[in-house]
């Protein structure tokens, strides 16, 4: 039997707060391995622009590259449409052995959000929670809400005792855009990836675009992702962003420019007999 923990997140970017949580969970003695789930299209973030899924997956992968007990999953990224936690858990359960245990790891804010999720009763009946207190919430407040969930759902909730590292993804992105020192914010491998691809270089202008454009591009990315290796995929995303930047500057169709940039190499990694 393997004791798995599931830690999900947008990871935009993966930062030292995520890394600290992972290390605390592994050091708790309660977990053998961690599944790091990179978020797909989240139901509560449809009006928020996030970086392309493949960028976020690669940042997470590099952020834990030295931790053998951690595996990064793209299960949600590969799924079309919105990703609900219950659907992810159902799919993940099919990949685990019947005698494996799965614990869900969250920040304490989830204790207040969970009742509004899809099928919270099913989630809490099947899976125990391991909670890290953070976000300015006191342990007393978190424990009071945990007691309410125990009473309403018979939830199994345990708290991590070690202090967390409080970091804001927005703060980290702004630091990277300004090319300021980031050693205390993100792992070195992640910083190198961000710098090499200038991942947040056009954020000021691209964030202002209609989120519907990003949803369309995200769907194209999901479809093209299986056909490209990592190097070619990241290159295509870089071209997509630069094409959109130029389209905005010259008042051209931003969506068309983005699609053209993303798909310009879509057959580059295919065998000749497949293309023909």
Task: Give residue ranges: language-model regions.
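Nucleotidyltransferase catalytic core that binds NTPs
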Residues: 1-215
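Acidic/His-rich, divalent-metal-binding segments that scaffold phosphate/diphosphate chemistry
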Residues: 202-276
């Amino acid at each position: 039997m393997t004791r798995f923990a599931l830690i999900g997140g947008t990871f935009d970017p993966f930062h030292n707060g995520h890394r600290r949580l992972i290390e605390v969970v592994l050091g708790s003695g309660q977990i053998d391995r961690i599944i790091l789930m990179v978020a797909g299209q989240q139901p509560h973030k449809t009006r928020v622009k996030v970086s392309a899924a493949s960028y976020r997956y690669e940042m997470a992968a590099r952020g834990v590259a030295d931790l053998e007990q951690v595996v990064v999953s793209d299960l949600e990224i590969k799924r079309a449409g919105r990703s609900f936690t219950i659907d992810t858990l159902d799919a993940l359960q099919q990949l685990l052995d019947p005698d494996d245990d799965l614990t869900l790891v969250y920040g304490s804010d989830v204790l207040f959000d969970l009742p509004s999720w899809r099928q919270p009763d099913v989630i809490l009946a099947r899976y125990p929670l391991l909670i890290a207190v953070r976000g300015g919430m006191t342990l007393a407040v978190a424990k009071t809400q945990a007691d309410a969930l125990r009473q309403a759902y018979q939830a199994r909730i345990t708290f991590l005792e070690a202090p967390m590292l409080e970091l804001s993804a927005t703060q980290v992105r702004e630091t990277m855009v300004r090319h300021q020192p980031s050693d205390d914010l993100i792992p070195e491998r992640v910083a190198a990836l961000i710098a090499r691809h200038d991942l947040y270089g056009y954020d000021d202008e691209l964030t202002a675009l209609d989120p519907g454009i990003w949803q369309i591009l995200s769907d194209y990315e999901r479809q093209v992702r299986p056909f490209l290796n990592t190097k070619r995929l990241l290159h295509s995303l870089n071209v997509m962003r630069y094409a959109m930047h130029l389209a905005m500057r010259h008042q051209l169709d931003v969506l068309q420019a983005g699609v053209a940039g993303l798909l310009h190499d879509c057959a580059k990694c295919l065998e000749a007999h497949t293309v023909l």
